[in-house]
A protein has these predicted regions:
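A short beta-loop-alpha structural element at the N-terminal edge
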Residues: 2-17
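Conserved acetyl-CoA-binding loop-helix of GNAT-fold acetyltransferases
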Residues: 85, 91-104, 130
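Conserved beta-strand in the GNAT
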Residues: 54, 60-69, 79, 84
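Conserved GNAT acetyl-CoA-binding A-motif
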Residues: 99, 106-119
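Conserved beta-strand-loop-alpha-helix junction that forms the acyl-donor binding cleft
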Residues: 115-125, 143-146
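Conserved GNAT-fold acetyl-CoA-binding loop/helix
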Residues: 20-42, 50
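Conserved active-site tyrosine of GNAT-family acetyltransferases
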Residues: 19, 128-129, 133
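A conserved beta-turn-beta hairpin within the catalytic core of GNAT-like acetyltransferases
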Residues: 70-80, 90, 136-138
């Protein structure tokens, strides 16, 4: 059984360690360090509308989901910026369980819409589709190196 807590600044070091472990492994194969991951998570945690939860299985950190809310003319949209499940916990439904709890908590905050970005064509895309997300046909993601 999972237990949850809202993310606080004191949690960021342990979350950064899990982040490095998760995203430096396949399918991402990134090159995060504890310092760069800590900076990224701290930047998000300092946002005015930041919200996130971390999940524990038998008192061991096993996942997190976090982001921030944005006001639009027709309501509040929550942007999930990071969602990860410890590598040793993946593949047994923990990610879906964490997401369902997070969504329940967002609804309690009167947030009705969630969006995120993920890599196309890998297990993450399938995970989000399985949890009710769909590709937005009206929006595109653009980038430019400067």
């Amino acid at each position: 059984m999972l237990t949850y807590k809202e993310i606080e600044k004191e949690d960021l070091a342990s979350l950064a360690a899990m982040y490095v472990e998760t995203f430096n492994a396949p399918p991402w194969n990134d090159a995060w360090t504890p310092e760069t991951a800590g900076t990224r998570l701290r930047q998000m945690a300092e946002a005015e509308t930041f919200y996130g939860i971390c999940a524990y299985e038998e008192d061991v950190l096993c996942g997190m989901v976090l982001g921030f809310a944005e006001q639009f003319y027709d309501g509040v949209l929550f942007e999930i910026k990071e969602f990860c499940v410890r590598n040793t916990s993946r593949g047994n439904g923990i990610g879906s369980e964490i997401y369902r709890e997070f969504e329940r908590r967002l609804r309690e905050r009167n947030i009705e819409n969630v969006q995120l970005m993920t890599l196309r064509g890998n297990a993450s895309e399938h995970f989000y589709e399985k949890n009710g997300f769909e590709t937005d046909k009206d929006l595109i993601f653009m980038k430019k190196q400067i």
